[in-house]
Protein backbone atom coordinates (compact mmCIF):
# COMPACT_ATOMS: atom_id res chain seq x y z
CA UNK A 1 0.00 0.00 0.00
CA UNK A 2 2.82 2.41 0.79
CA UNK A 3 4.40 1.75 -2.60
CA UNK A 4 1.13 2.68 -4.29
CA UNK A 5 0.88 5.93 -2.31
CA UNK A 6 4.47 6.82 -3.11
CA UNK A 7 3.90 6.08 -6.79
CA UNK A 8 0.83 8.32 -6.88
CA UNK A 9 2.62 11.15 -5.07
CA UNK A 10 5.60 10.86 -7.42
CA UNK A 11 3.37 10.82 -10.49
CA UNK A 12 1.50 13.87 -9.22
CA UNK A 13 4.75 15.78 -8.67
CA UNK A 14 6.08 14.78 -12.10
CA UNK A 15 2.84 16.03 -13.65
CA UNK A 16 3.15 19.36 -11.82
CA UNK A 17 6.73 19.72 -13.05
CA UNK A 18 5.68 18.84 -16.60
CA UNK A 19 2.90 21.43 -16.45
CA UNK A 20 5.29 24.12 -15.26
CA UNK A 21 7.93 23.26 -17.87
CA UNK A 22 5.49 22.89 -20.74
CA UNK A 23 5.18 26.26 -22.45
CA UNK A 24 4.36 25.36 -26.04
CA UNK A 25 0.94 23.78 -26.64
CA UNK A 26 -2.35 24.38 -24.86
CA UNK A 27 -3.45 20.79 -25.47
CA UNK A 28 -0.44 19.38 -23.60
CA UNK A 29 -1.10 21.70 -20.67
CA UNK A 30 -4.73 20.55 -20.51
CA UNK A 31 -3.62 16.91 -20.64
CA UNK A 32 -1.30 17.54 -17.67
CA UNK A 33 -4.16 19.09 -15.70
CA UNK A 34 -6.42 16.16 -16.57
CA UNK A 35 -3.74 13.70 -15.45
CA UNK A 36 -3.48 15.55 -12.15
CA UNK A 37 -7.23 15.29 -11.66
CA UNK A 38 -7.18 11.55 -12.37
CA UNK A 39 -4.38 11.06 -9.85
CA UNK A 40 -6.35 12.99 -7.23
CA UNK A 41 -9.39 10.84 -8.04
CA UNK A 42 -7.33 7.66 -7.57
CA UNK A 43 -6.00 8.95 -4.26
CA UNK A 44 -9.51 9.78 -3.05
CA UNK A 45 -10.79 6.34 -3.98
CA UNK A 46 -7.85 4.62 -2.28
CA UNK A 47 -8.04 6.66 0.91
CA UNK A 48 -11.84 6.46 1.15
CA UNK A 49 -11.71 2.69 0.83
CA UNK A 50 -9.53 2.60 3.97
CA UNK A 51 -11.83 4.79 6.04
CA UNK A 52 -15.43 3.66 6.12
CA UNK A 53 -17.06 7.03 6.74
CA UNK A 54 -20.33 7.56 4.93
CA UNK A 55 -19.92 11.34 4.62
CA UNK A 56 -16.90 11.04 2.28
CA UNK A 57 -18.39 8.40 -0.01
CA UNK A 58 -19.71 10.72 -2.78
CA UNK A 59 -16.52 12.82 -2.95
CA UNK A 60 -14.78 10.77 -5.72
CA UNK A 61 -17.89 10.91 -7.90
CA UNK A 62 -18.19 14.67 -7.41
CA UNK A 63 -14.50 15.14 -8.27
CA UNK A 64 -14.84 12.95 -11.35
CA UNK A 65 -17.88 14.95 -12.51
CA UNK A 66 -16.07 18.26 -12.08
CA UNK A 67 -13.03 16.84 -13.88
CA UNK A 68 -15.13 15.74 -16.86
CA UNK A 69 -16.79 19.16 -17.04
CA UNK A 70 -13.38 20.83 -16.95
CA UNK A 71 -12.08 18.57 -19.70
CA UNK A 72 -15.09 19.38 -21.89
CA UNK A 73 -14.59 23.13 -21.38
CA UNK A 74 -10.87 22.78 -22.08
CA UNK A 75 -11.49 20.84 -25.27
CA UNK A 76 -14.01 23.40 -26.48
CA UNK A 77 -11.46 26.16 -25.77
CA UNK A 78 -8.83 24.30 -27.79
CA UNK A 79 -11.25 23.94 -30.70
CA UNK A 80 -12.22 27.63 -30.56
CA UNK A 81 -8.60 28.80 -30.32
CA UNK A 82 -7.53 26.50 -33.15
CA UNK A 83 -10.31 27.85 -35.35
CA UNK A 84 -9.45 31.50 -34.67
CA UNK A 85 -5.64 31.34 -34.52
CA UNK A 86 -4.91 28.27 -36.64
CA UNK A 87 -2.88 26.50 -33.92
CA UNK A 88 -2.77 25.96 -30.18
CA UNK A 89 0.60 27.51 -29.42
CA UNK A 90 0.58 29.30 -26.09
CA UNK A 91 3.07 31.93 -27.23
CA UNK A 92 0.70 33.16 -29.97
CA UNK A 93 -2.21 33.67 -27.59
CA UNK A 94 -2.86 37.20 -26.45
CA UNK A 95 -5.79 36.90 -24.09
CA UNK A 96 -5.88 40.56 -23.04
Swiss-Prot record:
Catalytic activity: a ubiquinone + NADH + 5 H(+)(in) = a ubiquinol + NAD(+) + 4 H(+)(out)
GO annotation, cellular component aspect: mitochondrial membrane; respiratory chain complex I
GO molecular function, one term: NADH dehydrogenase (ubiquinone) activity
Top enzyme category: translocase
Residues that span the membrane, as ranges: 1-21, 27-47, 61-81
Homology family: Belongs to the complex I subunit 4L family.
Entry protein name: NADH-ubiquinone oxidoreductase chain 4L
Source organism of this protein record: Lycodon semicarinatus (Ryukyu odd-tooth snake)
Amino acid sequence: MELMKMTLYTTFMITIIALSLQQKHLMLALMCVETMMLIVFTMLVMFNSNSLTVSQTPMPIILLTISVCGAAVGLSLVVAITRTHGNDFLKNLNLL
